[in-house]
Amino acid sequence: MDIRQMNRTHLDHWRGLRKQLWPGHPDDAHLADGEEILQADHLASFIAMADGVAIGFADASIRHDYVNGCDSSPVVFLEGIFVLPSFRQRGVAKQLIAAVQRWGTNKGCREMASDTSPENTISQKVHQALGFEETERVIFYRKRC
């Protein structure tokens, strides 16, 4: 298995994996996200490849605003991670996280953060298994003006 930072040749593989994680996200929106990741210095995606097949990805960003539970800035933020079901429990996600962490460290980050919804217990377990610690639970509100 090989972990690579996404480049243009990986876009179709990445989009296929991403559609499995976020199936409600329109295809053209995935493409626009991919183009933005390729062009922006504060965004990156890493692809796990095995025998020429994309088996997982991790999207990340560098955030300079307040990140819940963090004490420093900037923070490398895990925006999303996905591994094909047949490749789970084999250390793929761990290697993807290590690549994201190295990228963030090279960008001056001392902390990595992520989030998930309170009802997504599978994601919570994955985060804990990958070394993340829960920092807080937040409910957001809005009021239209």
Curated annotation (Swiss-Prot):
Reactions that this protein is recorded to catalyse: kanamycin B + acetyl-CoA = N(6')-acetylkanamycin B + CoA + H(+)
Top-level class of the enzyme under EC nomenclature: transferase
Single annotated GO MF: aminoglycoside 6'-N-acetyltransferase activity
Residues engaged in binding substrate: W22, H25, Y66, E79, D115, E136
Pfam families given in the database record: Acetyltransf_1
SUPFAM superfamilies in alphabetical order: Acyl-CoA N-acyltransferases (Nat)
Keyword set includes Plastid: no
Entry's EC annotation: 2.3.1.82
Record-annotated N-acetyltransferase domain positions: 1-145
The entry's keywords: Acyltransferase, Antibiotic resistance, Transferase
NCBIfam families in the cross-refs: AAC_6p_group_E (NF043067), AAC_6p_Salmo (NF000140)
Described purpose of this protein according to its UniProt entry: Catalyzes the transfer of an acetyl group from acetyl-CoA to the 6'-amino group of aminoglycoside molecules conferring resistance to antibiotics containing the purpurosamine ring.
Description of how the protein assembles with itself and partners: Homodimer.
Name of the protein in question: Aminoglycoside N(6')-acetyltransferase type 1
Organism of derivation: Salmonella typhimurium (strain LT2 / SGSC1412 / ATCC 700720)
